[in-house]
């Protein structure tokens, strides 16, 4: 087996919290007095996972595929973007092994919404929920996350080449 038949990708996204926007994380609408500012629905969790997938397959990043300068993506549903990223990764000859993600937010408490985020990720990635994980952390009131100015998401994915597909 070629050692590059298995690849990892790392993704990161950050958005500011602002009044007048819905807070959507992992495709889940979360009750809060503010939401994330962005060109699309600003789902930082799904953006981090999407970026990790593109990176693992050496396909660039989310901005290359879904630029924030393109009006077609204004207000876009990040679940749709993630499913398209999955299609492109599979088209490149890879399957997804698992995803592990962390959302860093002082407020709101995300624990009640984690199972919904995991279910959405599993559905969009075509994986069982046992291969999708989301963790929520505060920043212990430190930095912009701790001051409730924004939310960060980080993700790691593992992908592997399908048998019989071209090698590096």
Curated annotation (Swiss-Prot):
EC code: 4.6.1.12
Residues engaged in binding 4-CDP-2-C-methyl-D-erythritol 2-phosphate: 13-15, 39-40, 61-63, 66-70, 144, 147
Enzyme class, broadest EC rank: lyase
Needed cofactors: a divalent metal cation
Coiled coil: none
Pfam families (UniProt xref): YgbB (PF02542)
SUPFAM superfamilies: IpsF-like
Pathway(s) per entry: Isoprenoid biosynthesis; isopentenyl diphosphate biosynthesis via DXP pathway; isopentenyl diphosphate from 1-deoxy-D-xylulose 5-phosphate: step 4/6
Cofactor note: Binds 1 divalent metal cation per subunit.
Domain of life: Bacteria
Record has Lipoprotein as a keyword: no
Record-annotated site: Transition state stabilizer: 39, 138
Sample GO molecular function, one term: metal ion binding
Record field: catalytic activity: 4-CDP-2-C-methyl-D-erythritol 2-phosphate = 2-C-methyl-D-erythritol 2,4-cyclic diphosphate + CMP
UniProt entry keywords in alphabetical sequence: Isoprene biosynthesis, Lyase, Metal-binding
One of the GO biological process terms: terpenoid biosynthetic process
Amino-acid positions noted as binding a divalent metal cation in the UniProt annotation, renumbered to this chain: 13, 15, 47
NCBIfam families documented for this protein: ispF (TIGR00151)
Role summary: Involved in the biosynthesis of isopentenyl diphosphate (IPP) and dimethylallyl diphosphate (DMAPP), two major building blocks of isoprenoid compounds. Catalyzes the conversion of 4-diphosphocytidyl-2-C-methyl-D-erythritol 2-phosphate (CDP-ME2P) to 2-C-methyl-D-erythritol 2,4-cyclodiphosphate (ME-CPP) with a corresponding release of cytidine 5-monophosphate (CMP).
Family, per entry: Belongs to the IspF family.
Complexes and interactors: Homotrimer.
Protein name: 2-C-methyl-D-erythritol 2,4-cyclodiphosphate synthase
Gene name in the database record: ispF
